[in-house]
């Protein structure tokens, strides 16, 4: 791999997009701080205050950024993580997992090749949220028998 390609690969691996609604605003700020300190380039797609907003708008912004190739992975935060997960999974090519434990966050990447982690600002505190993000971002897709299953999931996108 040439130097430029290797540098771009490393840069993209440490880059992610993040978005939230009002229910996830405080947790999003904690995640950005933690991940930036951990060496990630974090692109914040909003929301920008704890004022009430509609979560599908921010899920859409993040999923469109991923599908454009702006970053390989994303994190969405709302009150429970559920609404963001539902909205994100409406997008072709997105495999979003809603997690409140580190094992599920890790396995979402390892077995399902998830590209979006969703969590709830009213479900997990900042410490747990940061641990979820670390587990998700440090895990790698295992491939093998799981690759076949991800191909099946991708085929469902095409069937729509």
Locate predicted features:
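Glycine-rich phosphate/diphosphate-binding loop of Rossmann-like nucleotide-binding domains
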Residues: 17-37
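A short beta-strand-loop structural module common to alpha/beta enzyme folds
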Residues: 41-52
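Phosphate-coordination loops involved in phosphoryl transfer and adenosine-cofactor binding
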Residues: 13, 71, 113
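Helix-adjacent hinge/juxtasegments
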Residues: 58-97
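Short, Lys/Arg-enriched N-terminal segments with co-localized hydrophobic residues
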Residues: 2-11
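C-terminal binding/interaction regions
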Residues: 17-19, 23-24, 102-160
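Short hydrophobic/aromatic-enriched beta-strand-loop microsegments
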Residues: 41, 94-101
């Amino acid at each position: 791999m040439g130097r430029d390609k290797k540098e771009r690969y490393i840069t993209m691996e440490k880059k992610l997009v993040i978005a939230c609604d009002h229910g996830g605003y405080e947790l999003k700020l904690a995640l950005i701080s933690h991940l930036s300190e951990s060496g990630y380039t974090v692109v914040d797609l909003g929301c920008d205050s704890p004022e009430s907003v509609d979560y599908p708008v921010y899920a859409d912004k993040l999923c469109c950024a991923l599908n454009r190739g702006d970053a390989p992975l994303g994190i969405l935060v709302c009150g429970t993580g559920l609404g963001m997960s539902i909205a994100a999974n409406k997008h072709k090519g997105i495999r979003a997992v809603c997690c409140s434990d580190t094992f599920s966050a890790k396995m979402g990447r390892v077995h399902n090749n998830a590209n979006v982690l969703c969590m709830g600002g009213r479900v997990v505190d900042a410490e747990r949220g940061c641990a979820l993000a670390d587990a998700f971002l440090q895990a790698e897709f295992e491939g093998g028998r799981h690759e076949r299953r991800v191909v099946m999931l991708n085929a469902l996108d095409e069937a729509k």
